[in-house]
């Protein structure tokens, strides 16, 4: 059956969309194996503990109080809808590593769907919008974004910034169709919320204008449609400037109140530094850039990686092959430039920041968190380039006989990108995610629950070993207000040889079914010999395993363990070398 006949079937386009969404989600969800990164290591713990220990009514009142603090200009930055600085009900999604990542992925996919919808609407081609839907999941730098960047960090900050901008874009096009002012009002409000979430929102007026131009085919009409969105931005800008002015007055002692430190987001007009940081930030938004510069190998490839690659790439190539009517050159140029604006404009804001102009903050493979939404712009640019190549190839005499080969090569390249990123992400981060999970399970099961005022040191370093973060971890998982320290930091300090300290650690086995956590009482700056040792074997550990450990007199002990399906706590007698505790197959 010819391709044209297949694409005309009623089931073809719904099937392409379903395959793309299902396997695109599966592909991007690989980073649920990675540990938390950046400020999430502290903020997630604090906010989840807060929401689970506060009544619903009080949490609503606290949220309204935080909003009032923002709208009354008591903070140096006007970000009332930002996440995670403002406490809110979304804190319920911060407690579980996998659940948190899936929550952010839901935001990301909502943006993907809205971007595709907006492209399809602006180009007056639903098929082009579906092609955009299929391409976008492959545009993210999954390996590099897995921990410390916002595709999977910072409470979906940039995703929740982009979403109202996309709604504003759809609203102005609807206003053009109907003439109803309510759509203009909606666009204005959405841009207000966008800019009041994160400052990169101010740049989205540019792609909105570009897509409005694509829709109307006239720059003048596009300017008219952009006015409501621009007014929404102006309102936010007024609040933002007001907040900075009030903060300056408080810093000068003219007004009472605390002063916010906002030097890192105040612009620095050092042109060479701006251009260098701008270029580096833009480069980080391209999907394979970090892996190529980092010479990252894929590691072990599983059949599921190949399946995801084949299905995601297959859906994208099928959508491109079925494009029977391509945008003209002007429309395609506007689509490309709109994508370029989504890449370059947020990156320019980062380039203006004195904080990120400093060496080491941004490089050719690592950008700040806006790089995630820059990837949406890369997707629009890639779509425009592919459309241009399709138009060129379809005009050649060799196209009818060679198109199958070219589509196959394109599919192989796309699938290879997906397989490479997915396998590399698992290889790079799987052990970190396993360590975080089993360590948290052990604390939740009661390890160190009886420590009292005795200090606790942890083998797993939270937020660089910061004591506030270490304490927050025990509060979150064990409801325990512990005097917690990172073992690496503890060993650099002076401690008496007889100073008692509990050590909580973990040992990773051959796979997650052999991961364990343990706790014991040691002494001094190097608590390597422990007594009163408890070992936690979490749910999911294989039955009939063997626990190995070595005593202080170098005797290796082999102990068979029989596990409960909900997890098992085992007590060991004598003096035991902490680093010798491990679980293995029978």
What are these regions (language model features)?
Residues 4, 8-131, 221-233, 247-333, ...:
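Intrinsically disordered, polar/acidic, low-complexity terminal segments
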Residues 119-144, 163:
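Transmembrane-helix signature of polytopic, membrane-embedded enzymes
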Residues 135, 327-358, 407-414:
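Transmembrane alpha-helix segments characteristic
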Residues 144-167, 197, 373:
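Multi-pass, polyprenyl lipid-linked donor-dependent membrane glycosyltransferases
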Residues 157-158, 357-388:
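Hydrophobic/aromatic-rich transmembrane helices and adjacent perimembrane loops
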Residues 160-184, 220:
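Membrane-interface transmembrane helices that cradle and orient dolichyl/undecaprenyl
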Residues 182-199:
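Membrane-interface alpha helices of multi-pass inner-membrane proteins
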Residues 203-237, 242, 246:
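Perimembrane helix-loop-helix junctions
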């Amino acid at each position: 059956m010819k391709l044209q006949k297949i694409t005309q079937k009623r089931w073809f386009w719904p099937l392409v969309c379903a395959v793309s969404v299902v396997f695109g989600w599966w592909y991007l969800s690989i980073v649920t194996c990675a540990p938390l990164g950046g400020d999430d290591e502290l903020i997630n713990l604090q906010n989840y503990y807060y929401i689970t220990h506060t009544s619903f009514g009080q949490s609503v009142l606290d949220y309204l109080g935080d909003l009032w603090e923002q709208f009354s200009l008591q903070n140096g930055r006007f970000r009332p809808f930002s996440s995670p600085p403002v406490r809110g009900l979304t804190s319920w999604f911060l407690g579980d590593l996998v659940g948190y990542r899936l929550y952010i992925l839901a935001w990301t996919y909502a943006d993907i769907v809205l971007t595709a919808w907006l492209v399809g609407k602006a180009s007056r081609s639903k098929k082009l919008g579906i092609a955009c839907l299929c391409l976008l999941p492959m545009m993210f730098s999954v390996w590099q974004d897995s921990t410390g960047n916002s595709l999977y960090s910072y409470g979906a900050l940039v995703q929740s910034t982009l979403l109202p901008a996309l709604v504003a874009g759809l609203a102005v096009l609807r206003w053009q169709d109907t003439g109803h002012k309510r759509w203009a009002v909606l666009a204005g409000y959405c841009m207000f919320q966008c800019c009041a979430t994160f400052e990169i929102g101010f740049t989205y007026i540019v792609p909105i204008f570009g897509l409005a131009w694509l829709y109307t085919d006239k720059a003048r009409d596009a300017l008219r449609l952009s006015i409501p969105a621009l007014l929404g931005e102006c309102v936010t800008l007024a609040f933002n400037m007001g907040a900075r002015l009030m903060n300056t007055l408080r810093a000068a002692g003219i007004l009472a109140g605390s002063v916010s430190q906002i030097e890192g987001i105040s612009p620095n007009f050092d042109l060479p530094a701006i251009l260098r940081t701008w270029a580096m930030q833009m480069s980080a938004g391209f999907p394979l850039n970090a892996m190529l510069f980092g010479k990252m190998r894929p590691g072990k490839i599983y059949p599921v990686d190949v399946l995801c690659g084949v299905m995601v790439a297959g859906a994208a190539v099928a959508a491109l092959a079925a494009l029977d009517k391509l945008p003209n050159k002007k429309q395609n140029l506007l689509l490309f430039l709109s994508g370029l604006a989504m890449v370059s404009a947020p990156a320019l804001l980062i380039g203006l920041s004195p904080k990120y102009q400093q060496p080491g903050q941004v490089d050719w493979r690592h950008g700040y968190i806006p790089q995630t939404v820059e990837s949406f712009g890369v997707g629009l640019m890639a779509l425009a380039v592919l459309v241009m190549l399709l138009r060129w190839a379809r005009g050649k005499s060799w196209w009818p006989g060679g198109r199958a080969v070219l589509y196959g090569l394109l599919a192989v390249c796309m699938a290879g990108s997906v397989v490479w990123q997915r396998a590399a992400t698992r290889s790079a981060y799987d052990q970190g995610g396993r360590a975080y999970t089993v360590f948290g399970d052990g604390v939740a099961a009661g390890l160190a629950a009886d420590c009292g005022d005795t200090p606790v040191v942890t083998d797993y370093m939270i937020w660089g070993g910061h004591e506030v973060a270490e304490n927050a971890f025990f509060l979150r998982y064990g409801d325990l207000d512990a005097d917690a320290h990172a073992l690496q930091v503890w060993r650099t300090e002076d401690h008496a040889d007889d100073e008692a300290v509990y050590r909580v650690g973990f040992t990773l086995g051959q796979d997650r079914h052999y991961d364990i956590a343990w706790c014991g009482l040691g002494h001094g700056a190097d608590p390597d010999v422990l007594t009163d040792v408890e070992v936690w074997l979490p749910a999911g550990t294989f039955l009939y395993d063997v626990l190995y450990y070595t005593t202080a007199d170098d005797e290796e002990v082999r102990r068979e363990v029989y596990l409960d399906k909900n997890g098992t706590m085992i007590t060991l007698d004598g003096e035991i070398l902490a680093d010798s505790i491990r679980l293995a197959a029978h």
